[in-house]
Amino acid sequence: MVDREELIIEKCAGKKVLHIGCCATPACKEECEKGTLLHLNLLKSASELWGLDMCREDITFLQDQYQVENLVVGDAELIDQLFPPGAFDVIVAGELIEHLGNPGLFLVGARGLLAPEGTIIVSVPNGIAFRRGLKSLSGRETVHPDHNFYFSRKTLSQMLLSCGYEMVDIHGFRMKRSEFFGAWISDLFASMFSQWACEGIIATARPSS
């Protein structure tokens, strides 16, 4: 398993980056106070950083309280209407596509915004994490109220391939914000047996030639 944020920051170093869902709504203010908001940490790594989020209130908060520039309010599914083609070296979509009504529309639009040799980094909760399998044995299912989709390593890879990408790498990762016992059990099991039983999956892909 990998450290999600360390991997993203490393892959964005010295690059022109577009961060989708940059405000981490509704946890924006809390993460800023803790120093854990990914967008603020990416500012130290990327050569140029842009952010896109639908929450105007949190965008304004980052602009006013942290003097963050290059922030755009908009819909990720309309991304190709918001930025010019080939504008970015890296697009980061962390815990985003499971919230969308049409993740394929977003991924196809994002592909056109990548520069030659550009990459997209997508992270998602793992739909087949160990704890979810345990709950299913008792007839229960863990579903976040804002999630429209769940992904596994295979289905995330297949979606990226079907949207015109080729895989660079894919890993399991621990959810740092997951403090509840079930998530800890998933990550413990993953560390002992298989990383694909852990709480999250992160993939890097590039447009297929």
Protein language model features and the residues they cover:
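Residues at the starts of beta-strands that form the adenosine-phosphate
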Residues: 16, 39, 47-48, 119, ...
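A short beta-strand submotif of the Rossmann-like class I SAM-dependent methyltransferase core
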Residues: 19, 90-96
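Conserved SAM-binding loop
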Residues: 51, 89, 122
